[in-house]
């Protein structure tokens, strides 16, 4: 699933609930300092990804337009969090787009194998 991905890759992480422990037999494919399970394989054709690489230039602002989401980020990261988060996403946008395309191609390949 992550064939062709760099060893370390950025993602947008904005979730209140996350998988922290995998069931027996599942394989942890990616982790980060903030989330011990970023991607996992649960069965030969069942995967999960928690970090977002499928973002577009407006994604952070769109999510921030939802009051509960904005409040959550502000309470965790402080004033100006949206601007910092949006700027960080913008810096990585080209890589996000390349990784999203790679992930799509990988999903198509493993779905038919």
Predicted regions mapped to residue ranges:
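Acyltransferase
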Residues: 58-113
